[in-house]
């Protein structure tokens, strides 16, 4: 709800909190939340549980079950890898290029547990792709400092490094 209502046709954004609060006023208090997150982000491990606790203190009688993220570790989710492989095949067909180098990019996270999901997906991709296909990992953004080195390189740095090594190969 950080965007002002005037930028949303005069209507305030519906947040999880406002949505749950509205449903509770209607007498609905049992919910199952299926998050569209790959890993255990702070929203899943901290923000949503804190919100539920606060609403229960204020309103009471709220029961929320939160399912696991899309790629629960350590077992991972091979179907996500299958989706990525399908996208690679489609891109290869559409561009008529045979990529030798692929970069798996996530948003970046202050949490090593969230980053572990990208690492799991990259490792699973490596195990399923043809020999000779290079998988790199990158983050769109990351916080400064050595405590965030688990994110790896920024995408721009990876692309520059790959271009310097071989600017002709996809």
Task: Describe each region flagged by the PLM.
Residues 1-170:
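Active-site-proximal alpha-helix that buttresses catalytic centers in soluble enzyme cores
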